[in-house]
Swiss-Prot record:
<keyword id="KW-0862">Zinc</keyword>
<keyword id="KW-0456">Lyase</keyword>
<keyword id="KW-0963">Cytoplasm</keyword>
<keyword id="KW-0028">Amino-acid biosynthesis</keyword>
<dbReference type="InterPro" id="IPR030960">
    <property type="entry name" value="DHQS/DOIS_N"/>
</dbReference>
<dbReference type="InterPro" id="IPR056179">
    <property type="entry name" value="DHQS_C"/>
</dbReference>
<protein>
    <recommendedName>
        <fullName>3-dehydroquinate synthase</fullName>
        <ecNumber>4.2.3.4</ecNumber>
    </recommendedName>
</protein>
<feature type="binding site">
    <location>
        <begin position="146"/>
        <end position="147"/>
    </location>
    <ligand>
        <name>NAD(+)</name>
    </ligand>
</feature>
<dbReference type="GO" id="GO:0005737">
    <property type="term" value="C:cytoplasm"/>
</dbReference>
<feature type="binding site">
    <location>
        <position position="168"/>
    </location>
    <ligand>
        <name>NAD(+)</name>
    </ligand>
</feature>
<comment type="similarity">
    <text>Belongs to the sugar phosphate cyclases superfamily. Dehydroquinate synthase family.</text>
</comment>
<dbReference type="InterPro" id="IPR016037">
    <property type="entry name" value="DHQ_synth_AroB"/>
</dbReference>
<keyword id="KW-0520">NAD</keyword>
<dbReference type="GO" id="GO:0009423">
    <property type="term" value="P:chorismate biosynthetic process"/>
</dbReference>
<comment type="function">
    <text>Catalyzes the conversion of 3-deoxy-D-arabino-heptulosonate 7-phosphate (DAHP) to dehydroquinate (DHQ).</text>
</comment>
<dbReference type="InterPro" id="IPR030963">
    <property type="entry name" value="DHQ_synth_fam"/>
</dbReference>
<dbReference type="Pfam" id="PF24621">
    <property type="entry name" value="DHQS_C"/>
</dbReference>
Length: 385
């Protein structure tokens, strides 16, 4: 990899950690990936601060596991800190919680020179990033993702936001962090279901444009899920390298970055139908959405049926859902309602949904010519009783 590529990696053999750079000119920032980084957080964060003060935002689940080690590391580095613990769960990505967080920060006399620090999964990262984008017209923030999903996807790239009654992530802003700190050791504390949900986003990178990575996942995915530290580091590093490259080329999703939404158009509709509740985690929705996207690709004559079957087989093998009807607590799915929900997708232009489809594993593309009949047939095949 040449020095001027979007994501330059420098390995530190002694610490088994790596550093990537998201190259965005003056707004470039590092991604640290490896084990034990939470204990070094203060030393890694300190050089990037305008002044040695941060405000940590986390949720109740993460606080019980990781807040004290982080605060100790910040204190050891001479960084003053406050913190707030929010409720855990997707419901926290809401207007009401955003307002509550902003009011709390303003009441605490938060200053522009203080840095917000998001410690948690995608919900906390998205909420805190959006708060940072609009508080005092923009303040610095740092991502410390504690889930596999957040480490490989949501913490990188500057997408922030909240959910609304009309759909997921429909209100938000592009606001890049100053640093992403992905401690792969914290993944050991994740429940298996959460880890699997994150794996759905990992698989996505192989399907988009990296067939060799998909091959690797077929061989090593089970070990990654079972706790193989080396496999986890490799997967996070590969995913972050891919995303960093795409973000550097297309920060605001005007073109190629939209490919990273593979599985999300169908997946977000499924999530909306479940009320963004515990019935369906985001990564599970992405897995289901990828299966449906490749099914639509087959129906449109774009993708060999064998590739769609290969994706489904791998997701089944590791334990991710591939059939919405088999979800515990699933609603009475309705294909027409799901189709209507897709009309609120962020990728709608001139009344048409832009789908991320595939010509095969590792060969994704944007497609605006999907006819309603084919989309509806895909939905019915997935959810009809």
């Amino acid at each position: 990899m040449s020095p001027d590529t979007a994501a330059d990696a420098a390995a530190d053999p002694a610490l088994q950690s790596s550093v990537l750079t998201v190259s965005l000119g003056e707004r470039s920032y590092p991604i640290h990936i490896g084990p034990g980084l939470l204990g070094r957080a203060g030393a890694l964060i300190a050089p990037l601060l305008r002044k040695p003060r941060v405000f940590v935002v986390t949720d109740a689940t993460v606080a019980a596991l990781h807040l004290d080690p982080l605060l100790a590391s910040l204190g050891a580095a001479g960084i003053a800190h406050d913190h707030v613990v929010l409720p855990a769960g997707e419901a926290t990505k809401s207007f009401s919680q955003l307002e509550e967080l902003l009011d709390l920060l303003l009441a605490a006399r938060f200053e522009r020179s203080t840095t917000l620090l998001a410690l948690g999964g995608g919900v906390i990262g998205d909420l805190v990033g959006f708060a940072a984008a609009i508080l005092l017209r923009g303040v610095d923030f740092i991502q410390i993702p504690t889930t596999l999903l957040a480490q490989v996807d949501s913490s990188v790239g500057g997408k922030t936001g909240i959910n609304t009654a009309y759909g997921k992530n429909l209100v938000g802003a592009f606001h890049q962090p100053r640093l992403v700190l992905a401690d792969t050791t914290v993944l050991d504390t994740l429940p298996r279901r959460e880890l699997l949900a994150g794996y759905g986003e990992v698989v996505k990178y192989g399907v988009i444009d990296d067939p060799a990575f998909f091959d690797w996942l077929e061989e090593h995915g089970s070990a990654l899920i079972a706790g193989d530290g080396g496999a986890r580091i490799h997967a996070v590093l590969t995913a972050c390298r891919a995303k960093a490259r795409v973000v550097a080329e297309d920060e605001r999703e005007g073109g190629r970055r939209a490919l990273l939404n593979l599985g999300h158009t169908f997946g977000h509709a499924l999530e909306a139908e479940t009320g963004f509740g515990p019935t369906l985690l985001h990564g599970e929705a992405v897995a289901l959405g990828m299966v449906m996207a490749l099914d639509l690709s087959v129906r449109l004559g774009l993708c060999p049926p064998a590739d769609a079957a290969r994706l489904r087989a791998h997701l089944d093998h590791v334990g991710l859902p591939t059939d919405p009807r088999r979800l515990e607590g699933a609603p009475a799915w309705n294909a027409e309602r799901l189709l209507a929900a897709m009309d609120h997708d962020k990728k709608v232009e001139d009344g048409k949904v832009t789908f991320v489809l595939a010509r095969g594993i590792g060969r994704s593309l944007l497609w605006r010519e999907a006819d309603t009949a084919s989309v509806l047939a895909t939905l019915r095949a997935a959810v009809a009783p």
